[in-house]
């Protein structure tokens, strides 16, 4: 299966390093947009391993990154017809209001062109509130074919009740998702 990534990277050594890593993973870089602006920067996050009983923690430093400035007019129009499955995470929607708007428009355009929409409800409380996340992702669900959502996110952020099987079946019944995958942490 040929896969590609849609992203925007700074036009500098760091951006080229990331592009080369993408290529090394046998992922097409045809849809990488390069940011030539003086403000160009790569978004990063820092991971600190936890030591029991303290959990691991993540610090996101993605504000004002090149990716956050991605706009629809930077993408070739043929991308929508060429794509069979478009996968996106809710983290993308949480990074920046303008990027959220762009990502939602991309979901609609891929859906209209006949692509399957694969969506990972990867909720991160450090990026946005449960209320905003719930409102945003529930508006996207009607377009989603393949849904990835944890039991914890379903119960807490999305306020679903019932057995895990009932909750997952509810996504299919309510929104028409054809495949729902979940994780259960013990």
Task: Provide a role label for each language-model segment.
Residues 23, 108-112, 141:
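Anion (oxyanion) recognition and catalysis
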Residues 85-87, 118, 148, 181:
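Structural motif
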């Amino acid at each position: 299966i040929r896969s590609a990534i849609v992203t925007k990277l700074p036009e500098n050594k760091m951006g080229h390093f990331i592009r080369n890593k993408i290529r090394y993973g046998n992922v097409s870089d045809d849809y990488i947009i390069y940011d030539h602006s003086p403000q160009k920067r790569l978004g990063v996050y820092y991971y600190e391993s936890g030591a029991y009983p303290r959990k691991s923690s993540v610090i996101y430093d993605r504000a004002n990154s090149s990716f956050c400035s991605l706009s629809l007019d930077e993408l070739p129009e043929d991308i929508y017809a060429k794509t069979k499955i478009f996968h996106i995470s809710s983290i993308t929607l949480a990074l920046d209001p303008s990027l959220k708007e762009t990502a939602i428009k991309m979901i609609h355009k891929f859906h209209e062109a006949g692509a399957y929409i694969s969506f990972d409800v990867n909720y991160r409380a450090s990026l946005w509130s449960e209320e905003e996340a719930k409102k945003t992702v529930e508006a996207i669900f009607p377009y989603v074919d393949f849904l990835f959502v944890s039991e914890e996110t379903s119960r807490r952020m999305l306020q679903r009740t019932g057995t895990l099987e009932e909750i997952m079946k509810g996504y299919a019944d309510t929104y028409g998702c054809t495949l729902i995958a979940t994780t259960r942490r013990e």
